[in-house]
Amino acid sequence: MDAKTDDQGGKCPFPHGGGSRGHRNRDWWPEQLDINMLHRNSTLSDPLGKAFDYAKEFESLDLDAVIKDLHALMTDSQDWWPADFGHYGGLMIRMAWHSAGTYRTTDGRGGAGAGQQRFAPLNSWPDNANLDKARRLLWPIKQKYGNKISWADLYVLTGNVALESMGFKTFGFAGGRADTWEPEELFWGPEGSWLGDERYSGERQLHDALGAVQMGLIYVNPEGPNGNPDPVAAAKDIRETFARMAMNDEETVALIAGGHTFGKTHGAGDPSLIGAEPEGGALEDQGLGWKSKFGTGFGADAITGGPEVIWTQTPTQWSNFFFENLFGFEWELDKSPAGAKQWKAKGAEATVPDPFDPTKKRVPTMLTTDLSLRFDPAYEKISRRFFENPDQFADAFARAWFKLTHRDMGPKVRYRGKLVPKEDLIWQDPIPPVDHELVSAKDIADLKARILASGLSVSQLVSTAFASASTYRHSDKRGGANGARIRFAPQKDWEVNQPADLAQVLGKLEAIQKAFNDAQSGGKKVSLADLIVLGGSAAVEKAAKDAGTEVEVPFTPGRMDALEEQTDGDSFKVLEPRADGFRNFIGKRHQFMQPEEALVDRAQLLNLTAPEMTVLLGGLRVLGGNVGHDSHGVFTDRPEKLTNDFFVNLLDMKTAWSLSATAEGVYEGRDRKTGDLRWTGTRVDLIFGSHSQLRALAEVYGQSDAQTKFAQDFVAAWTKVMNADRFDLAAK
């Protein structure tokens, strides 16, 4: 047989070189539900392996030695990237700030907790220009101490040391941020170009999910909204974006003024002379970006953005000069050598040092967003108080900096190292330590029996336990069942938590708690937080037994009940779900995702895999977990029994599905022969039969031999959610 191919000339029919690649599935079907986020940063991408315990490694670190080396680094100027004013402090503060400053309260994502700044897209954001140099300057120290300190911790620690080395007393430092090993691929905005601002609607309404004003910025445009040098208008952007990072006005003023006490911005020349960002660079650039053709490209010729601003007379020393200059001068609009809008002190003497020539001086300069602290009425009051009371300013900046760099770490039980502050802060969502003997296995069995005899249904117990635990966000480690904050506002009043039912369940559980605790003589107690979870466990076991399957739901006591004064109700508002596919709930607030997308998003926040998401949803449907007790997705005639009926009936080809003509967002499943209505479901339900990957998972649980596996896998996923915030268990 002739081995030659017809018109290929014997050549391989697949393209090579030139960056060619075939189309991915999403190129063909861009509207396909993406569930890849459920499997990113798994142990498969972690080179350190499952057994590696970063918290333990950090505890063995000689922290004093690292800090000493960082102090030495600050003034060890390198020829390939010289230090401004002979000190890298300003650069390192910016690196740490921009590592933490991506945090957003909406979903808890972003922040310093995972060392994501070294990955795309953050490593190539315009606002992070030349921070690649800061990270390369740190490499010898990271290399020296290896796995005992993560990049994530090193970024934040370096920022602290930079401040300390310039005479500022920080509030403290906590280690414990384990590195991740691949980009998170978050939704940073709808724009397809850097600095795009299609995220606004109406009268400058910023997209609900986002925390910055333009693609590739951490917060705001320093030249003003869309480059308009209006300090008052800029203040509106500042207030909005900093609030979405959990900062109030005082913290915002302290952070801006404190951070801008040090260092400078870089706009020495034409920005068009800057080369590609790190991800767009050539192979030989080895991950360094923004190579500049302006002069030497570094030092006095450095270009990071547009403005060329030095705020204070002592840019490597803590001072009150920022406020002295802000209020001491009148300001006139100017342009940097790069053509950016900025402000200079009107009629001022040249008192600010040049970063590289000790014989030269400059006049003080400010950004439009700096002047916002004077010309916005609310900011002005705070700024003037800080100006007149430097000690208050220093304390406010220290606390705000600590909050900025630790906000996404979760509760203090996750903090590591000897520099952890002793003071409890309300934004840490404190929970009292265990101060009593915990219940025994015998007590647990007794409490389960009392709960099941209380008249509460499987549906009520499961719904309450899930409502309590599913507030957890793995992104910033907030929420969860520990603390039993579901009994406080705002959670007790959320529509998704069915307030009337919730009040009834909590009332009966509190009565059981009181009766049990009052009967103890040796100080043994059970918390309501534990009892809520135990009630769900008892209900799941009963539902499985009623379906003919024996299961034991693991339960570990040790949760405590938070006090109302330990709960910042306003800060918990962001945990309220707009939609919750696990409970077939769509709220009244604006939805910016399809219901099935919101389900995947929520599953990722709960740290669930696709199989765990699948089995958990299927189980909750038959257990009566829907909000409002509606029947959508309840594909069973055996409710409150832990069966695999959801999958069996969804996959049944005797049923034909169509969009309801009378109910929005509802699908009707009718008998193919008779047309009789069998079931109703939502997009969240039907996606498990429509999406090929999710259907494959559903088929595992819809098989004839699947009942036992289904029950066991449901229990495992359920327990994972119930224990998601039990960092005390992980620490043991």
Curated annotation (Swiss-Prot):
The protein's Enzyme Commission number: 1.11.1.21
List GO molecular-function terms, semicolon-separated. Answer: catalase activity; heme binding; metal ion binding
Q: Where is this site: Transition state stabilizer?
A: 94
Q: Which InterPro entries match?
A: Catalase_peroxidase, Haem_peroxidase, Haem_peroxidase_sf, Peroxidases_AS, Peroxidases_heam-ligand_BS
Give the span(s) annotated as Disordered. Answer: 1-26
Q: What does this protein do?
A: Bifunctional enzyme with both catalase and broad-spectrum peroxidase activity.
The UniProt similarity line reads: Belongs to the peroxidase family. Peroxidase/catalase subfamily.
Q: Which HAMAP family match?
A: Catal_peroxid (MF_01961)
Q: What's this protein's name?
A: Catalase-peroxidase
Q: Which species does this protein come from?
A: Rhodopseudomonas palustris (strain BisB5)
